[in-house]
Swiss-Prot record:
<dbReference type="InterPro" id="IPR023674">
    <property type="entry name" value="Ribosomal_uL1-like"/>
</dbReference>
<dbReference type="InterPro" id="IPR016095">
    <property type="entry name" value="Ribosomal_uL1_3-a/b-sand"/>
</dbReference>
<keyword id="KW-0678">Repressor</keyword>
<dbReference type="InterPro" id="IPR028364">
    <property type="entry name" value="Ribosomal_uL1/biogenesis"/>
</dbReference>
<comment type="function">
    <text>Binds directly to 23S rRNA. The L1 stalk is quite mobile in the ribosome, and is involved in E site tRNA release.</text>
</comment>
<dbReference type="InterPro" id="IPR002143">
    <property type="entry name" value="Ribosomal_uL1"/>
</dbReference>
<dbReference type="GO" id="GO:0006417">
    <property type="term" value="P:regulation of translation"/>
</dbReference>
<dbReference type="GO" id="GO:0000049">
    <property type="term" value="F:tRNA binding"/>
</dbReference>
<keyword id="KW-0689">Ribosomal protein</keyword>
<comment type="subunit">
    <text>Part of the 50S ribosomal subunit.</text>
</comment>
<keyword id="KW-0694">RNA-binding</keyword>
<keyword id="KW-0820">tRNA-binding</keyword>
<keyword id="KW-0810">Translation regulation</keyword>
<dbReference type="GO" id="GO:0015934">
    <property type="term" value="C:large ribosomal subunit"/>
</dbReference>
<dbReference type="Pfam" id="PF00687">
    <property type="entry name" value="Ribosomal_L1"/>
</dbReference>
<dbReference type="GO" id="GO:0019843">
    <property type="term" value="F:rRNA binding"/>
</dbReference>
<keyword id="KW-0687">Ribonucleoprotein</keyword>
C-alpha cells in the first residue's frame, strides 16, 4: 500500500491544481499520472450552466466516439420476429422477449446496454424498478428504443456512449483508456464537448460550459481550460 501511495503522490506532483490546461496537455498528464496496474478508463467531467430541475434544461443523449471507449459493450435486445433476427445479425449478445425479462427479474445483469423495439416497451417497462436505478432503461433520446435495431447495435459496438446531466449539472462520460494515443483521446474529448454544445438548451442562461476536468480511474482530476468552449 505504501508503494502505491508513493506512486500516487509522485503523480500528483506532475499536476498543478491551480492550472487549467489545454485539452491535449491535460490528456497527456492523465496518461502520465496513471499509476494503476490495469488499463484505466479516461473520463471527462463537464459542469454545465443548466438547471436540471427544469424540464427544458435537461440534457440527455448519445454519441458515437470516433475511437470508441476501449471497452466492448455487451448488448441485449428486446425484439421479436424479423427484428430479433436483425439484432442477432448485427452482433447483439442477447436477443429475446419474456425469457430475458424473467432472467433480469431474477437478478441477471450480464450486459451493458439494452435496446428495445417500441412494440416491446410495454413489457420492458415492467422492469423499470430494476433497470431504472442502474441506468439501463431503454430511452428514445439515446437511440435505444427503435425499430432500427441494426443501426442501434452497430453504433453501440462501434463506441456509442450515453451522456446525461445529473442533479448538480454535471456530465461524466468515458472517452477511452490510458493506453490510447493522446490524439485519439483528444478527438473523443472534442466530440463530447462539441456534442454538448449542439444540444445546449435555449433556456440556458449565462456561461454554458463552466468547468471541464479529465481523469483516469485511479488518477487525479486535471482541469481543462474552458476558454474555447465556454460560450
Amino acid at each position: 500500500m505504501a508503494k502505491k501511495g508513493k506512486k500516487y503522490a509522485d503523480a500528483l506532483k506532475l499536476v498543478d491544481r491551480d492550472t487549467a490546461y489545454q485539452a491535449e496537455e491535460a490528456l497527456e498528464l492523465v496518461k502520465k499520472t496513471s499509476v494503476a496496474k490495469f488499463d484505466e478508463t479516461v473520463e471527462v467531467a463537464v459542469r454545465l450552466g443548466v438547471d436540471p430541475k427544469k424540464a427544458d434544461q435537461q440534457i440527455r443523449g448519445a454519441v458515437v466516439l470516433p475511437h470508441g471507449t476501449g471497452k466492448t459493450q455487451r448488448v441485449l435486445v428486446f425484439a421479436k420476429g424479423e427484428k430479433a433476427k436483425e439484432a442477432e445479425a448485427a452482433g447483439a449478445d442477447y436477443v429475446g422477449e419474456d425469457d430475458l425479462i424473467n432472467k433480469i427479474n431474477q437478478g441477471w445483469f450480464d450486459f451493458d446496454v439494452i435496446v428495445a423495439t417500441p412494440d416491446m416497451m410495454a413489457q420492458v417497462g415492467r422492469l423499470g424498478r430494476v433497470l431504472g436505478p442502474k441506468g439501463l432503461m431503454p430511452n428514445p433520446k439515446t437511440g435505444t428504443v427503435t425499430f432500427d435495431v441494426t443501426k442501434a447495435v452497430e453504433e453501440i459496438k462501434a463506441g456509442k456512449v450515453e451522456y446525461r446531466v445529473d442533479k448538480s449539472g454535471n456530465i461524466h462520460v468515458p472517452i477511452g483508456k490510458v493506453s490510447f494515443d493522446t490524439p485519439k483521446l483528444l478527438e473523443n474529448f472534442q466530440t463530447i464537448v462539441e456534442t454538448l454544445h449542439k444540444v445546449k438548451p435555449a433556456a440556458a442562461k449565462g456561461t454554458y460550459v463552466k468547468n471541464i476536468a479529465v481523469a483516469s480511474t485511479m488518477g487525479p482530476g486535471i482541469r481543462v481550460t474552458t476558454t474555447a468552449f465556454a460560450k
